[in-house]
Amino acid sequence: MQDIKQRDIEHVILVGCQVNREDEEFEQSIAELESLAKTAKGKVVGTITQKREKVESSTYVGKGKVQELVHLIEETEADLVIFNDELQASQMRNLHAECGIAVIDRTQLILDIFASRAKSREGKLQVELAQLKYLLPRLSGQGLALSRQGGGIGTRGPGETQLETDRRHIRRRMNEIERQLEAVVNHRVRYREKRKKNAAIQLALVGYTNAGKSTLLNRLTKADTLEEDQLFATLDPTTRQLHLPSGFSVLMSDTVGFIQDLPTTLVASFRSTLEELKEADLLLHVVDCSHPDYEQHERTVIKLIEELEAHSIPQLLIYNKADQKTDVFIPTHTKDSIIMSAYNEEDLLALKVKIEQALKGMMMPYRSIIKADEGHILAAARQETMIHTQQFDESREAYVIEGHALENTSIYSQLKERLLKES
Protein backbone atom coordinates (compact mmCIF):
# COMPACT_ATOMS: atom_id res chain seq x y z
CA MET A 1 0.00 0.00 0.00
CA GLN A 2 1.34 3.40 -0.99
CA ASP A 3 2.35 5.66 1.90
CA ILE A 4 0.20 8.76 1.54
CA LYS A 5 1.48 12.10 2.74
CA GLN A 6 -1.48 14.15 3.88
CA ARG A 7 -1.82 17.58 2.28
CA ASP A 8 -4.03 20.44 3.38
CA ILE A 9 -5.62 20.19 -0.07
CA GLU A 10 -5.77 16.67 -1.44
CA HIS A 11 -4.82 15.98 -5.04
CA VAL A 12 -7.72 14.24 -6.74
CA ILE A 13 -8.26 12.32 -9.98
CA LEU A 14 -11.81 12.10 -11.36
CA VAL A 15 -13.04 9.06 -13.29
CA GLY A 16 -16.29 8.87 -15.25
CA CYS A 17 -17.92 6.28 -17.48
CA GLN A 18 -20.37 7.54 -20.12
CA VAL A 19 -23.17 5.00 -20.44
CA ASN A 20 -26.51 5.92 -22.08
CA ARG A 21 -25.84 9.63 -21.67
CA GLU A 22 -25.60 12.45 -24.19
CA ASP A 23 -22.16 14.09 -24.43
CA GLU A 24 -23.37 17.41 -23.02
CA GLU A 25 -25.14 15.80 -20.05
CA PHE A 26 -22.07 13.67 -19.26
CA GLU A 27 -19.74 16.68 -19.46
CA GLN A 28 -22.04 18.60 -17.10
CA SER A 29 -21.96 15.70 -14.65
CA ILE A 30 -18.13 15.59 -14.67
CA ALA A 31 -17.97 19.39 -14.24
CA GLU A 32 -20.30 19.09 -11.25
CA LEU A 33 -18.13 16.32 -9.78
CA GLU A 34 -15.15 18.69 -10.02
CA SER A 35 -17.13 21.38 -8.17
CA LEU A 36 -18.03 18.85 -5.48
CA ALA A 37 -14.35 17.87 -5.14
CA LYS A 38 -13.35 21.53 -4.75
CA THR A 39 -16.07 22.04 -2.14
CA ALA A 40 -14.55 19.11 -0.21
CA LYS A 41 -11.14 20.89 -0.29
CA GLY A 42 -9.74 18.81 -3.12
CA LYS A 43 -7.63 19.89 -6.10
CA VAL A 44 -8.38 18.06 -9.34
CA VAL A 45 -5.08 17.08 -10.99
CA GLY A 46 -6.48 14.81 -13.68
CA THR A 47 -9.65 13.41 -15.26
CA ILE A 48 -10.17 10.09 -17.03
CA THR A 49 -13.36 9.30 -18.96
CA GLN A 50 -14.54 6.40 -21.07
CA LYS A 51 -17.59 5.84 -23.29
CA ARG A 52 -19.00 2.31 -22.96
CA GLU A 53 -22.23 0.40 -23.59
CA LYS A 54 -22.13 -0.74 -19.96
CA VAL A 55 -19.74 -0.38 -17.02
CA GLU A 56 -17.10 -3.05 -16.40
CA SER A 57 -18.51 -5.28 -13.65
CA SER A 58 -15.16 -5.74 -11.87
CA THR A 59 -13.52 -2.31 -12.17
CA TYR A 60 -16.22 0.09 -13.50
CA VAL A 61 -13.95 1.15 -16.43
CA GLY A 62 -12.04 -1.19 -18.73
CA LYS A 63 -8.64 -2.71 -17.95
CA GLY A 64 -6.84 -0.30 -20.27
CA LYS A 65 -8.37 2.69 -18.48
CA VAL A 66 -7.44 1.20 -15.10
CA GLN A 67 -3.80 1.03 -16.24
CA GLU A 68 -4.06 4.61 -17.53
CA LEU A 69 -5.38 5.58 -14.10
CA VAL A 70 -2.49 3.85 -12.31
CA HIS A 71 0.05 5.73 -14.48
CA LEU A 72 -1.76 9.05 -13.88
CA ILE A 73 -1.68 8.44 -10.11
CA GLU A 74 2.10 7.96 -10.25
CA GLU A 75 2.57 10.96 -12.54
CA THR A 76 0.48 13.39 -10.46
CA GLU A 77 1.19 11.89 -7.02
CA ALA A 78 -2.56 11.92 -6.42
CA ASP A 79 -3.99 11.15 -2.97
CA LEU A 80 -7.48 10.11 -3.98
CA VAL A 81 -9.57 8.85 -6.91
CA ILE A 82 -13.24 9.86 -7.13
CA PHE A 83 -15.60 7.95 -9.44
CA ASN A 84 -18.62 9.73 -10.91
CA ASP A 85 -21.09 6.90 -10.20
CA GLU A 86 -21.85 4.78 -7.16
CA LEU A 87 -19.45 1.83 -7.00
CA GLN A 88 -20.31 -1.68 -5.88
CA ALA A 89 -18.32 -3.14 -2.98
CA SER A 90 -16.44 -5.54 -5.28
CA GLN A 91 -15.54 -2.74 -7.72
CA MET A 92 -14.23 -0.57 -4.90
CA ARG A 93 -12.19 -3.45 -3.49
CA ASN A 94 -10.64 -4.24 -6.90
CA LEU A 95 -9.88 -0.59 -7.63
CA HIS A 96 -8.19 -0.16 -4.23
CA ALA A 97 -5.95 -3.11 -5.06
CA GLU A 98 -5.04 -1.69 -8.48
CA CYS A 99 -4.57 1.96 -7.50
CA GLY A 100 -2.86 1.67 -4.12
CA ILE A 101 -4.53 4.90 -2.93
CA ALA A 102 -7.97 5.74 -1.56
CA VAL A 103 -10.94 5.35 -3.91
CA ILE A 104 -14.38 6.82 -3.25
CA ASP A 105 -17.46 7.46 -5.39
CA ARG A 106 -19.78 10.40 -6.00
CA THR A 107 -22.17 9.31 -3.25
CA GLN A 108 -19.42 9.08 -0.64
CA LEU A 109 -18.12 12.51 -1.71
CA ILE A 110 -21.54 14.13 -1.25
CA LEU A 111 -22.01 12.41 2.11
CA ASP A 112 -18.58 13.69 3.14
CA ILE A 113 -19.52 17.28 2.25
CA PHE A 114 -22.75 16.93 4.21
CA ALA A 115 -20.79 15.62 7.21
CA SER A 116 -18.56 18.71 7.16
CA ARG A 117 -21.56 21.06 6.81
CA ALA A 118 -23.90 19.66 9.49
CA LYS A 119 -24.10 21.93 12.52
CA SER A 120 -27.31 21.00 14.36
CA ARG A 121 -27.73 17.78 16.32
CA GLU A 122 -30.45 16.67 13.90
CA GLY A 123 -28.30 17.40 10.85
CA LYS A 124 -25.37 15.45 12.25
CA LEU A 125 -27.59 12.47 13.08
CA GLN A 126 -29.15 12.48 9.61
CA VAL A 127 -25.74 12.56 7.91
CA GLU A 128 -24.36 9.82 10.13
CA LEU A 129 -27.37 7.61 9.39
CA ALA A 130 -26.93 8.13 5.65
CA GLN A 131 -23.21 7.32 5.88
CA LEU A 132 -23.84 4.16 7.89
CA LYS A 133 -26.48 2.98 5.39
CA TYR A 134 -23.94 3.55 2.63
CA LEU A 135 -21.02 1.89 4.47
CA LEU A 136 -22.77 -1.24 5.71
CA PRO A 137 -22.76 -3.22 2.43
CA ARG A 138 -19.32 -1.87 1.45
CA LEU A 139 -17.15 -2.50 4.51
CA SER A 140 -14.86 -4.94 2.71
CA GLY A 141 -13.91 -2.34 0.14
CA GLN A 142 -13.50 0.64 2.45
CA GLY A 143 -10.35 -0.30 4.34
CA LEU A 144 -7.95 2.14 2.69
CA ALA A 145 -10.45 5.00 2.51
CA LEU A 146 -11.20 4.79 6.23
CA SER A 147 -7.67 4.09 7.46
CA ARG A 148 -5.99 7.22 6.08
CA GLN A 149 -4.32 8.90 9.01
CA GLY A 150 -5.38 12.51 9.55
CA GLY A 151 -8.66 12.01 7.72
CA GLY A 152 -9.29 13.48 4.29
CA ILE A 153 -12.06 13.54 1.71
CA GLY A 154 -14.41 10.62 2.25
CA THR A 155 -13.40 10.02 5.88
CA ARG A 156 -15.48 12.64 7.70
CA GLY A 157 -18.22 11.14 9.82
CA PRO A 158 -18.28 7.59 11.23
CA GLY A 159 -14.79 6.45 10.27
CA GLU A 160 -13.75 4.49 13.36
CA THR A 161 -11.89 1.23 12.89
CA GLN A 162 -14.66 -0.59 14.74
CA LEU A 163 -17.07 0.22 11.92
CA GLU A 164 -14.88 -1.65 9.46
CA THR A 165 -15.22 -4.94 11.29
CA ASP A 166 -18.36 -4.88 13.37
CA ARG A 167 -21.57 -4.88 11.35
CA ARG A 168 -23.60 -5.43 14.51
CA HIS A 169 -22.18 -2.21 15.94
CA ILE A 170 -23.34 -0.34 12.81
CA ARG A 171 -26.85 -1.79 12.97
CA ARG A 172 -27.14 -0.93 16.68
CA ARG A 173 -25.99 2.61 15.99
CA MET A 174 -28.44 2.96 13.08
CA ASN A 175 -31.33 1.85 15.30
CA GLU A 176 -30.23 4.30 17.98
CA ILE A 177 -30.05 7.20 15.50
CA GLU A 178 -33.47 6.35 14.06
CA ARG A 179 -34.96 6.43 17.58
CA GLN A 180 -33.39 9.84 18.23
CA LEU A 181 -34.58 11.18 14.89
CA GLU A 182 -38.10 9.92 15.62
CA ALA A 183 -38.13 12.16 18.70
CA VAL A 184 -37.05 15.09 16.51
CA VAL A 185 -39.83 14.32 14.02
CA ASN A 186 -42.40 14.32 16.84
CA HIS A 187 -41.08 17.72 17.94
CA ARG A 188 -41.46 18.99 14.36
CA VAL A 189 -45.07 17.75 14.23
CA ARG A 190 -45.90 19.61 17.46
CA TYR A 191 -44.23 22.76 16.09
CA ARG A 192 -46.21 22.52 12.84
CA GLU A 193 -49.49 22.09 14.73
CA LYS A 194 -48.68 25.15 16.84
CA ARG A 195 -47.81 27.14 13.72
CA LYS A 196 -51.09 26.19 12.05
CA LYS A 197 -53.01 27.10 15.18
CA ASN A 198 -51.37 30.53 15.08
CA ALA A 199 -52.29 30.84 11.37
CA ALA A 200 -48.66 31.50 10.42
CA ILE A 201 -48.01 31.30 6.68
CA GLN A 202 -44.88 29.36 5.77
CA LEU A 203 -42.73 29.96 2.69
CA ALA A 204 -39.95 27.52 1.76
CA LEU A 205 -36.94 28.35 -0.39
CA VAL A 206 -36.01 25.37 -2.56
CA GLY A 207 -33.51 25.01 -5.34
CA TYR A 208 -30.37 23.44 -6.70
CA THR A 209 -27.33 23.78 -4.47
CA ASN A 210 -25.58 27.17 -4.78
CA ALA A 211 -28.58 28.82 -6.46
CA GLY A 212 -28.43 31.69 -3.95
CA LYS A 213 -31.17 30.67 -1.49
CA SER A 214 -29.27 31.77 1.64
CA THR A 215 -28.40 35.12 0.06
CA LEU A 216 -32.08 35.68 -0.77
CA LEU A 217 -33.12 34.76 2.78
CA ASN A 218 -30.58 37.18 4.23
CA ARG A 219 -31.41 40.03 1.87
CA LEU A 220 -35.18 39.65 2.24
CA THR A 221 -35.27 39.20 6.01
CA LYS A 222 -32.07 41.03 7.02
CA ALA A 223 -30.96 37.77 8.62
CA ASP A 224 -27.37 36.59 8.97
CA THR A 225 -27.08 33.00 7.80
CA LEU A 226 -24.07 31.40 6.14
CA GLU A 227 -23.46 32.56 2.57
CA GLU A 228 -20.75 30.84 0.56
CA ASP A 229 -20.13 30.35 -3.14
CA GLN A 230 -19.90 26.62 -2.53
CA LEU A 231 -22.10 23.58 -2.99
CA PHE A 232 -24.20 22.70 0.09
CA ALA A 233 -23.19 25.79 2.10
CA THR A 234 -26.55 25.45 3.88
CA LEU A 235 -27.47 22.11 5.39
CA ASP A 236 -29.49 22.85 8.53
CA PRO A 237 -32.86 24.52 7.85
CA THR A 238 -33.15 28.17 8.90
CA THR A 239 -36.43 30.02 9.47
CA ARG A 240 -36.82 33.80 9.59
CA GLN A 241 -39.70 36.30 9.57
CA LEU A 242 -40.39 38.17 6.34
CA HIS A 243 -42.30 41.48 6.32
CA LEU A 244 -44.25 42.09 3.11
CA PRO A 245 -45.11 45.55 1.66
CA SER A 246 -48.61 45.48 3.18
CA GLY A 247 -47.09 44.96 6.63
CA PHE A 248 -48.19 41.31 6.70
CA SER A 249 -45.56 38.94 8.11
CA VAL A 250 -44.84 35.36 7.06
CA LEU A 251 -42.23 32.74 7.96
CA MET A 252 -39.53 31.94 5.40
CA SER A 253 -37.34 28.82 5.59
CA ASP A 254 -34.11 28.02 3.78
CA THR A 255 -33.59 24.34 2.96
CA VAL A 256 -30.76 22.06 1.94
CA GLY A 257 -29.84 22.41 -1.73
CA PHE A 258 -30.77 19.68 -4.18
CA ILE A 259 -28.38 18.10 -6.66
CA GLN A 260 -28.60 15.71 -9.59
CA ASP A 261 -28.28 12.07 -8.49
CA LEU A 262 -28.68 12.99 -4.83
CA PRO A 263 -27.78 9.79 -2.93
CA THR A 264 -30.88 7.76 -2.03
CA THR A 265 -29.47 7.13 1.47
CA LEU A 266 -29.29 10.89 1.96
CA VAL A 267 -32.84 11.50 0.75
CA ALA A 268 -34.11 8.78 3.11
CA SER A 269 -32.13 10.06 6.10
CA PHE A 270 -33.12 13.70 5.49
CA ARG A 271 -36.76 12.89 4.80
CA SER A 272 -37.99 14.50 8.04
CA THR A 273 -36.23 17.74 7.06
CA LEU A 274 -37.24 17.60 3.40
CA GLU A 275 -40.86 16.88 4.35
CA GLU A 276 -40.99 20.36 5.87
CA LEU A 277 -41.53 21.41 2.25
CA LYS A 278 -44.88 19.61 2.28
CA GLU A 279 -46.04 21.88 5.10
CA ALA A 280 -45.23 25.10 3.22
CA ASP A 281 -48.01 27.29 1.83
CA LEU A 282 -45.80 28.54 -1.01
CA LEU A 283 -42.57 27.16 -2.50
CA LEU A 284 -40.03 29.69 -3.75
CA HIS A 285 -38.03 27.74 -6.35
CA VAL A 286 -34.70 29.55 -6.80
CA VAL A 287 -32.76 28.95 -10.03
CA ASP A 288 -29.28 30.32 -10.80
CA CYS A 289 -30.06 31.69 -14.27
CA SER A 290 -26.36 32.46 -14.88
CA HIS A 291 -25.41 28.78 -14.70
CA PRO A 292 -24.96 27.06 -18.09
CA ASP A 293 -26.95 24.05 -16.82
CA TYR A 294 -29.82 26.05 -15.29
CA GLU A 295 -32.49 24.09 -17.20
CA GLN A 296 -31.19 20.75 -15.90
CA HIS A 297 -31.00 22.18 -12.37
CA GLU A 298 -34.59 23.39 -12.64
CA ARG A 299 -35.79 19.96 -13.84
CA THR A 300 -33.87 18.15 -11.08
CA VAL A 301 -35.53 20.23 -8.36
CA ILE A 302 -39.01 19.84 -9.89
CA LYS A 303 -38.48 16.06 -10.00
CA LEU A 304 -37.42 15.94 -6.32
CA ILE A 305 -40.39 18.10 -5.31
CA GLU A 306 -42.63 15.56 -7.07
CA GLU A 307 -40.89 12.65 -5.32
CA LEU A 308 -41.53 14.36 -1.98
CA GLU A 309 -45.21 14.71 -3.00
CA ALA A 310 -45.03 18.49 -2.61
CA HIS A 311 -45.85 19.31 -6.26
CA SER A 312 -49.43 20.38 -5.45
CA ILE A 313 -48.14 23.32 -3.38
CA PRO A 314 -48.19 26.65 -5.30
CA GLN A 315 -44.76 27.66 -6.60
CA LEU A 316 -43.08 30.91 -7.55
CA LEU A 317 -40.06 30.49 -9.83
CA ILE A 318 -37.22 32.89 -8.97
CA TYR A 319 -34.51 33.24 -11.61
CA ASN A 320 -31.71 34.60 -9.42
CA LYS A 321 -28.30 36.09 -10.35
CA ALA A 322 -29.79 38.05 -13.27
CA ASP A 323 -26.80 40.41 -13.03
CA GLN A 324 -24.60 37.49 -14.17
CA LYS A 325 -26.87 35.82 -16.74
CA THR A 326 -25.88 35.29 -20.37
CA ASP A 327 -27.84 35.54 -23.63
CA VAL A 328 -28.31 31.75 -23.50
CA PHE A 329 -30.87 32.10 -20.69
CA ILE A 330 -34.52 31.72 -21.71
CA PRO A 331 -37.05 31.59 -18.82
CA THR A 332 -39.63 28.83 -18.47
CA HIS A 333 -43.12 30.26 -18.81
CA THR A 334 -45.17 27.38 -17.43
CA LYS A 335 -45.03 28.82 -13.90
CA ASP A 336 -45.31 32.27 -12.36
CA SER A 337 -41.76 33.63 -12.36
CA ILE A 338 -39.50 36.62 -11.74
CA ILE A 339 -36.00 37.38 -13.06
CA MET A 340 -33.93 39.21 -10.46
CA SER A 341 -30.73 39.71 -8.52
CA ALA A 342 -30.64 39.27 -4.75
CA TYR A 343 -28.32 42.31 -4.58
CA ASN A 344 -30.75 44.69 -6.31
CA GLU A 345 -33.11 46.49 -3.89
CA GLU A 346 -35.74 47.14 -6.58
CA ASP A 347 -35.72 43.45 -7.49
CA LEU A 348 -36.14 42.46 -3.83
CA LEU A 349 -39.17 44.74 -3.51
CA ALA A 350 -40.61 43.34 -6.76
CA LEU A 351 -40.17 39.82 -5.34
CA LYS A 352 -41.98 40.78 -2.13
CA VAL A 353 -44.85 42.15 -4.22
CA LYS A 354 -44.90 38.89 -6.25
CA ILE A 355 -45.02 36.85 -3.04
CA GLU A 356 -47.85 38.99 -1.72
CA GLN A 357 -49.81 38.53 -4.96
CA ALA A 358 -49.30 34.76 -4.82
CA LEU A 359 -50.52 34.63 -1.22
CA LYS A 360 -53.60 36.73 -2.06
CA GLY A 361 -54.62 34.00 -4.47
CA MET A 362 -54.75 31.54 -1.56
CA MET A 363 -56.70 33.87 0.75
CA MET A 364 -60.25 35.21 1.00
CA PRO A 365 -60.98 38.92 0.44
CA TYR A 366 -62.90 40.80 3.12
CA ARG A 367 -64.25 44.30 3.79
CA SER A 368 -65.32 44.51 7.40
CA ILE A 369 -66.36 47.04 10.01
CA ILE A 370 -64.80 46.84 13.47
CA LYS A 371 -66.18 48.97 16.29
CA ALA A 372 -63.85 51.31 18.11
CA ASP A 373 -64.18 49.28 21.33
CA GLU A 374 -63.15 46.03 19.54
CA GLY A 375 -59.45 46.80 19.65
CA HIS A 376 -58.50 43.15 20.18
CA ILE A 377 -60.12 42.16 16.86
CA LEU A 378 -58.43 45.05 15.05
CA ALA A 379 -55.08 44.02 16.53
CA ALA A 380 -55.62 40.41 15.44
CA ALA A 381 -56.59 41.55 11.93
CA ARG A 382 -53.40 43.61 11.68
CA GLN A 383 -51.27 40.68 12.80
CA GLU A 384 -52.97 37.75 11.06
CA THR A 385 -54.36 39.20 7.82
CA MET A 386 -53.10 41.21 4.88
CA ILE A 387 -54.66 44.67 5.25
CA HIS A 388 -54.83 46.88 2.15
CA THR A 389 -56.89 49.83 3.43
CA GLN A 390 -57.92 50.99 6.89
CA GLN A 391 -60.11 54.03 7.60
CA PHE A 392 -61.97 55.33 10.63
CA ASP A 393 -65.66 56.06 9.90
CA GLU A 394 -66.75 58.72 12.37
CA SER A 395 -70.45 58.27 11.57
CA ARG A 396 -70.23 54.60 12.60
CA GLU A 397 -67.53 55.13 15.25
CA ALA A 398 -65.77 52.14 13.73
CA TYR A 399 -62.85 51.12 11.53
CA VAL A 400 -63.51 49.99 7.97
CA ILE A 401 -60.74 47.62 6.88
CA GLU A 402 -60.23 45.82 3.61
CA GLY A 403 -57.83 42.97 2.97
CA HIS A 404 -57.22 39.24 2.57
CA ALA A 405 -57.25 36.47 5.19
CA LEU A 406 -56.80 32.72 5.33
CA GLU A 407 -60.21 31.07 5.21
CA ASN A 408 -59.89 28.47 7.97
CA THR A 409 -58.85 30.85 10.74
CA SER A 410 -60.67 32.32 13.72
CA ILE A 411 -59.91 35.89 12.66
CA TYR A 412 -61.55 35.33 9.26
CA SER A 413 -64.66 33.97 11.00
CA GLN A 414 -64.79 37.11 13.14
CA LEU A 415 -64.29 39.37 10.13
CA LYS A 416 -67.03 37.53 8.20
CA GLU A 417 -69.45 38.29 11.04
CA ARG A 418 -68.59 41.97 10.63
CA LEU A 419 -68.71 42.25 6.83
CA LEU A 420 -69.63 45.76 5.74
CA LYS A 421 -73.09 45.86 4.18
CA GLU A 422 -73.27 48.62 1.58
CA SER A 423 -76.27 50.89 2.01
UniProtKB/Swiss-Prot annotation:
Residues holding GTP: 207-214, 232-236, 254-257, 320-323, 341-343
Binding site for Mg(2+): 214, 234
Native source species: Alkalihalophilus pseudofirmus (strain ATCC BAA-2126 / JCM 17055 / OF4)
Its biological purpose: GTPase that associates with the 50S ribosomal subunit and may have a role during protein synthesis or ribosome biogenesis.
Family: Belongs to the TRAFAC class OBG-HflX-like GTPase superfamily. HflX GTPase family.
Keywords of the record: Cytoplasm, GTP-binding, Magnesium, Metal-binding, Nucleotide-binding
Gene Ontology MF terms: GTP binding; GTPase activity; metal ion binding; ribosome binding
Assembly mode: Monomer. Associates with the 50S ribosomal subunit.
Gene (UniProt): hflX
This protein's GO CC annotations: cytoplasm
Domain Hflx-type G: 201-363
A Pfam family that the UniProt record links to this protein: GTP-bdg_M
The protein's required cofactors: Mg(2+)
Coiled-coil residue windows: none
Name of protein: GTPase HflX
Classification via CDD domains: HflX
Subcellular compartments: Cytoplasm
InterPro entries (alphabetical): G_HFLX_dom, GTP-bd, GTP-bd_M, GTPase_HflX, GTPase_HflX_N, GTPase_HflX_N_sf, P-loop_NTPase, Small_GTP-bd
